[in-house]
């Protein structure tokens, strides 16, 4: 019984620790997504190995840090496509993609349409941009 209690008592601490690392990672991503950061950069920032960071993200969020970073960037791209007149290349560069073709492929994979098609289906409205 004591062994079961000790095992259960340790779980929240490890989850809490993972949650702390994930929170620090999310803050780093939010501040640096516009740069071509990698999972290795995030892991180094929070002081974890790449594999430990992956486990922490999977435990806390159910996704990999790479997927979280990509999803975050695509959400930013959607906002810019809806609320600005920036070119697709400028948007790609502003969210950390140094290759607009790779950005377009990634966007299409996530959204089921190209950035251009997404923009056309969400016409720019100057009032929304304010």
Predicted features and spans:
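Terminal helix-turn-helix DNA-binding modules in bacterial transcription factors
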Residues: 27, 31, 36, 40, ...
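An amphipathic alpha-helical interaction segment
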Residues: 1-30, 52-54
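Residues within the alpha-helical elements of helix-turn-helix
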Residues: 45, 94-95, 110
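The DNA-contacting recognition helix of HTH DNA-binding domains
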Residues: 50-51, 55, 99-101
């Amino acid at each position: 019984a004591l062994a079961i209690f000790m095992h259960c008592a340790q779980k929240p601490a490890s989850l809490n620790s993972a949650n702390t690392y994930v929170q620090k990672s999310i803050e780093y991503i939010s501040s640096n997504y516009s740069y071509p950061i990698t999972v290795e950069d995030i892991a180094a920032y929070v002081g974890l190995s790449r594999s430990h960071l992956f486990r922490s993200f999977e435990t806390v969020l159910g996704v990999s840090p790479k997927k979280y970073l990509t999803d975050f960037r695509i959400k930013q791209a959607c906002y810019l496509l809806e609320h600005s007149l920036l070119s697709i290349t400028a948007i790609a560069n502003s969210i950390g993609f140094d290759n607009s073709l790779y950005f377009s492929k990634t966007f299409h994979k996530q959204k089921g349409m190209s950035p251009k098609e997404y923009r056309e289906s969400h016409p720019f409205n100057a009032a929304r941009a304010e």
